[in-house]
Amino acid sequence: MDAMDLTVAKFKEFTQLQSSAILLTVVSGIIVIVILLLRSKRRSSLKLPPGKLGLPLIGESLSFLWALRSNTLEQFVDKRVKKYGNVFKTSLLGQPTVVLCGAAGNRLILSNQEKLLSRTVSDRVAKLTGDTSISVIAGDSHRIIRAAVAGFLGPAGLKIHIGEMSAHIRNHINQVWKGKDEVNVLSLARELVFAISASLFLNINDREEQHQLHKTLETILPGYFSVPINFPGFAFRKALEGNSKRRKHFSVLQEKRRRDLSVGLASRTQDLLSVLLAYEDDKGNPLTDEEVLDNISALIDGSYESTSSQMAMLLKLLSDHPECYEKVVQEQLEIASHKKEGEEITWKDVKAMRYTWQVMQETLRMFAPVFGPRGKAITDIHYDGYTIPKGWQLSWATYSTHQNDTYFNEPDKFMPSRFDEEGGRLAPYTFVPFGGGRRKCPGWEFAKTEILLFVHHFVKTFSAYTPIDPHESIWGRPLPPVPANGFPIKLISRS
């Protein structure tokens, strides 16, 4: 075959391949169009919730993002509730979404999270918490991890470690808060919450080591709310790098602890790391190294903002309601009066902080996160006369019950006593600051105890405090709401 014939043959072969490629593209395009038409036809035959999906891909994302930026998300939801009712559809960040409001919506989500919904976190979050963290996994895996962490975060573990937690908080207030005329509550609360996690989860008590890990955490957290672009200079890349650095640090601690446990140099209950390394499920299987690392990291990240923000918001609300603060002072000083010098708070003492717990509940009612995705439908969901198609995202709005006068009298008013008068009569699924069902926040009792102990030692140490700006605004919804400037205050120590 001469060169000309070879060229012609190759040309014919190329033409045939090109024709095949074009044909394949056309056929694929037709198949996609048919699938889209069938889906469209199917959706048109379903009774979807009312609402608007907005522009293709964009949906109502611009309005939603503006509401986030301007702290008007409640108005974004309220406008649609008034127009469409407690169930409406929208499209957010390229995802068709159904928003459920009210107690019935809360019930559907919280009682069916594993039967009807996929995991509640995005791939972006999973890359930071790890694929085996309690916030990502479901089914038996979730049950096993939940049982493992409950041994430390629940009442049994708290009764063992409450004295240690109390001492950490007392020392932190004496060393970092006391002696200063002015402090930023949110900033120091974050420092305190991280120090407690570092000590009680990993037995890290060296101040410099805590400081370096705290700095690393501050590079990780923005990644949870950033665009997931893994490219130099972007927040998500910095978060991934920070997470990798932290995991290496934790891995070294884990290997040393495993050796110490094997030769009796460490206790099986001394901290969360030991508890997880020593845990075996009902079949005698231990947790993997990945499961231990993922869940310690996830619990540190999850508790950091939520707990510190509540400390700041609680003090801010009490500064606006001195009559409530005086009741807290009386309760805490009464408990302190029965303690000997140097004697720490006990589990029994915490259970006696009834009014302070009411204040905390009222703070959570008024300033819980407003809005959040709860997962994607893994099957068609029939609810309130509508069909929520498989693959659509479901979101809820906690404030739709927390701020609803159907469930709470005068919901705009700060009235901690409502949880004394109404606590036993609250309608189910109306007060849900920690979620509910099988995926209720696993650390809610740990956080509750931490905040109550903080209030106790704050009241014991300071006779009064005054906000620098009494009219400081609230920022951060739908994330944990916080005072816009961190709530700077002037402190007056007790003599």
Swiss-Prot record:
<dbReference type="GO" id="GO:0042617">
    <property type="term" value="P:paclitaxel biosynthetic process"/>
</dbReference>
<dbReference type="GO" id="GO:0020037">
    <property type="term" value="F:heme binding"/>
</dbReference>
<comment type="similarity">
    <text>Belongs to the cytochrome P450 family.</text>
</comment>
<feature type="binding site" description="axial binding residue">
    <location>
        <position position="441"/>
    </location>
    <ligand>
        <name>heme</name>
    </ligand>
</feature>
<keyword id="KW-0876">Taxol biosynthesis</keyword>
<keyword id="KW-0479">Metal-binding</keyword>
<dbReference type="InterPro" id="IPR017972">
    <property type="entry name" value="Cyt_P450_CS"/>
</dbReference>
<comment type="function">
    <text>Catalyzes the conversion of taxusin to 2-alpha-hydroxytaxusin in taxol biosynthesis. Catalyzes the conversion of 7-beta-hydroxytaxusin to 2-alpha-7-beta-hydroxytaxusin in taxol biosynthesis.</text>
</comment>
<dbReference type="GO" id="GO:0016020">
    <property type="term" value="C:membrane"/>
</dbReference>
<keyword id="KW-0560">Oxidoreductase</keyword>
<dbReference type="GO" id="GO:0005783">
    <property type="term" value="C:endoplasmic reticulum"/>
</dbReference>
<dbReference type="GO" id="GO:0016712">
    <property type="term" value="F:oxidoreductase activity, acting on paired donors, with incorporation or reduction of molecular oxygen, reduced flavin or flavoprotein as one donor, and incorporation of one atom of oxygen"/>
</dbReference>
<dbReference type="GO" id="GO:0016125">
    <property type="term" value="P:sterol metabolic process"/>
</dbReference>
<dbReference type="Pfam" id="PF00067">
    <property type="entry name" value="p450"/>
</dbReference>
<dbReference type="InterPro" id="IPR001128">
    <property type="entry name" value="Cyt_P450"/>
</dbReference>
<keyword id="KW-0503">Monooxygenase</keyword>
<dbReference type="InterPro" id="IPR002401">
    <property type="entry name" value="Cyt_P450_E_grp-I"/>
</dbReference>
<dbReference type="InterPro" id="IPR036396">
    <property type="entry name" value="Cyt_P450_sf"/>
</dbReference>
<keyword id="KW-0812">Transmembrane</keyword>
<keyword id="KW-0349">Heme</keyword>
<protein>
    <recommendedName>
        <fullName>Taxoid 2-alpha-hydroxylase</fullName>
        <ecNumber>1.14.14.-</ecNumber>
    </recommendedName>
</protein>
<keyword id="KW-0492">Microsome</keyword>
<feature type="transmembrane region" description="Helical">
    <location>
        <begin position="17"/>
        <end position="37"/>
    </location>
</feature>
<keyword id="KW-0408">Iron</keyword>
<keyword id="KW-0256">Endoplasmic reticulum</keyword>
<comment type="pathway">
    <text>Alkaloid biosynthesis; taxol biosynthesis.</text>
</comment>
<keyword id="KW-1133">Transmembrane helix</keyword>
<keyword id="KW-0472">Membrane</keyword>
<dbReference type="GO" id="GO:0005506">
    <property type="term" value="F:iron ion binding"/>
</dbReference>
